[in-house]
Amino acid sequence: MDTKKKYLVTGGAGFIGSNIAKTLEAQGHEVTVMDDFSKNGHFKNLIGFKGDVIAADCFKFMPRDMYFDAIFHEAAITDTTVMDQKAMMEQNVEAFKNVLAFAAENEVKKVIYASSAATYGNGPVPNVETQPTHPENVYGFSKVIMDNVARQFAEDNNDMTIIGLRYFNVYGPGEYFKGKMASMVFQLYNQMREGKRPRVFKFGEQQRDFVYVKDIVKINLCALNNGKETGVYNAATGIPRDYNAIIACLNKEMGLNLEPEYIDNPYPFFQLKTQADMTAAKEKLGYTPDYTLEAGIADYVKVLDAHYGRK
C-alpha cells in the first residue's frame, strides 16, 4: 500500500512553514511550497528541499486543478506591530478564505492553519481554547476572524476538517529572516555571541510559554494524523519560563557567563505571563511536547553555532 501523500504548505519558505515542509518531505511525502517571498519567506530556508515551489501570494492567486491530501496554511503577516489594518485583514483573513475555497473546489479534506495566542490578548492564564478572545492588536484580531471563518466554513462543508493551532512563543531554526520579530532566544543569542550582556526588561522575570519549532512541527503532524474534528488548539508546552532562564540556558550552552543587563520597560501594557492549557491538544490530538526549554535551546545553539561559524 502506497503511503506517500501530497501536501501543500503555504508560507513554506517562512520560519514554521519551511520546517513543516522539510519534515513532511523527509517522511517520504510529495510536498509543494507556496510563498510570495515578500515577507518572512526566504529561499535559504528551503536549501535542500526537493519539491515544487509556487512563487505566489495566496491573497491574489491560488493554483487550479491540483489535488492535495492536506494543506498546511502558514502564510500570513506575522509582524504584530503592523498597524495597516486593511493589509493585515487581506493577507491573513481574505487569503485564508481563498485557501479554503481552493480546498473545497479540489476536494481537499483537511486544512491545518496557523492561529495564534495573540487571540487571547491579556486574558486570564493559563489560556483555554474556550475562553473569550481579547486581541490587543489587529494581528490578533485577524486570527480571531480566521478562527471564525474556519468554524463557519467547516459547518458549510461538513466533509472537511479544519484545525487551527494557536502558536505561543515559538523559537528555533529558520527564524533568521524574521528580523525584529525573531524570538527572544535568537535575539539574546546574537547579543551574547558578540560578547554583549544580554538586555532584557527589569528584572527578567516576565514569563512566556516558549515552544521549540520541532514541537510546533509535531503538533501540526498530530493534527494531520489524529485530528478528527474542526476546532482550535493551543500549540505550546504549557510551562511558562522567564527571560532569566533563557539567559542561563544560553550561558550554559555557549560556554559563557554573561550577566543580564536590565533595562526599563517602555510598554505600559506589556504582558507579564503567557501560558497555554494543553489539555485539549493532548486529549484530542495526542500531542505532548518533546522539548523543555533547556533541551530546545541546547539543540538550537548547535544549529546557530554552525550557522555563524562559532566554535
What are the residue ranges of the model-derived segments?
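N-terminal Rossmann-like NAD(P)+-binding domain of SDR-like oxidoreductases, especially those catalyzing
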Residues: 1-166
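Short, solvent-exposed loop/turn segments at secondary-structure boundaries
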Residues: 83-87, 138, 175-180, 272
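Short-chain dehydrogenase/reductase
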Residues: 89, 136-144, 179-186, 209-210, ...
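Structural element of the ATP-grasp superfamily
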Residues: 99, 150, 188, 281-282
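Short glycine/proline- and charge-enriched loop/turn segments
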Residues: 126-133, 171, 262-263, 278-280
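NAD(P)-dependent short-chain dehydrogenase/reductase
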Residues: 148-208, 213-218, 222, 248-251
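C-terminal substrate-binding subdomain of Rossmann-fold SDR/epimerase-dehydratase oxidoreductases
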Residues: 193-311
